[in-house]
């Protein structure tokens, strides 16, 4: 995984995270927990979207990325 893309849509109240090129999206699967998984043709999860996600107007959205040791 070379690049991680995170999109926050305040108006649409969604947080979308892509693990790879979003043009590879083939199908979406709703999990029932207000989370949608985006998958490629091989069924691999390439991203997810959290529905009804919001950050209070007074707060900043900060994203921290940590990697696990090999």
Question: What are these language model-derived features?
Answer:
Residues 1-70:
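Small, basic N-terminal interaction modules of short regulatory proteins
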